[in-house]
Design a protein with these regions (language model features):
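A short, flexible beta-alpha/helix-coil linker loop
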Residues: 69-73, 155-157, 222
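Radical SAM/AdoMet-radical enzyme domain recognition
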Residues: 82-99, 107-220
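Conserved alpha-helical substructure of the radical SAM core
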Residues: 1-135
Length: 222
């Protein structure tokens, strides 16, 4: 654990590290939970620690088995709607917001704007990674309160079978960019009976670590 923590501190941009500690550690985990407990009594209902929302149903990929493609690209939350969700959430003590889709980075300008306006909150996007570029990394460093989970289904053959030719290389490039810029990110792994051995292998974990990943979520195919 100490090796992990030391590497995280050494390789993370100072502003990003500070914002993560303040927003996720203090605001969400400490101050927010105190407010949540009070609001549960006031409203006599459960209040979650985080809110998950889909900025858009649009996606630049068409992955095998993904339900998002069935919804097309016309379902979108406006910036004002997302802003309202976060504003109301903060009143209840919620300071952590996750975004899925679709591909949330189709709306990356609005997401950055949201991070900027609510700079005491932590934001996290589940993304395919193909829209990550240096300009976006610069914006992530500037706001400091946005992290990513990048989808990866295993090694090149398995990943590109589901996501399309060339996506594996784009994902590794995105991971390298994020790592070089001192940004915090992890991976989202969808496992099936076909890739389970690969995505639980030491070689796969070594690949994630080599390219700067800090954590991994594992989901079964739904």
């Amino acid at each position: 654990w100490m090796r992990y923590v030391n590497r995280l501190l050494d390789e993370t941009d100072p502003h990003v590290a500070k914002m993560t500690a303040l927003n996720l550690g203090f605001q969400a985990a400490f101050l927010g939970t105190k407010t949540i407990r009070k609001m549960r009594e006031v409203h006599n209902c459960n209040i979650p620690w985080l809110i998950l929302m889909d900025p858009t149903s649009a996606c630049n990929l068409h992955c095998i088995g993904c339900w998002a493609a069935e919804y097309g690209n016309k379902l979108n939350l406006t910036f004002d709607e997302m802003d309202s969700i976060v504003t109301q959430g903060k009143e209840l003590g919620i300071y952590f917001y996750m975004m899925t889709g679709g591909e949330p980075l189709v709306r990356k300008a609005d997401i950055i704007r949201l991070c900027e306006k609510h700079n005491e909150c932590a934001f996290h996007c589940y993304t395919n990674g193909t829209l990550v570029d240096q300009a976006f990394c610069d914006e992530m460093k500037r706001v400091g309160n946005l992290s990513l989970s990048i989808s990866l289904e295993g090694f090149e053959d398995a990943n590109d079978f589901r996501r399309g030719a060339g996506v594996y290389d784009k994902v590794l490039h995105a991971m390298d960019l994020l790592h070089e810029n001192g940004l915090i990110f992890g991976n989202s792994v969808c496992y099936t009976r076909k890739n389970m051995d690969a995505v639980t292998s030491d070689e796969f974990f070594d690949l994630l670590i080599e390219h700067g990943s800090r954590f991994a979520w594992y989901f079964h195919l739904m």
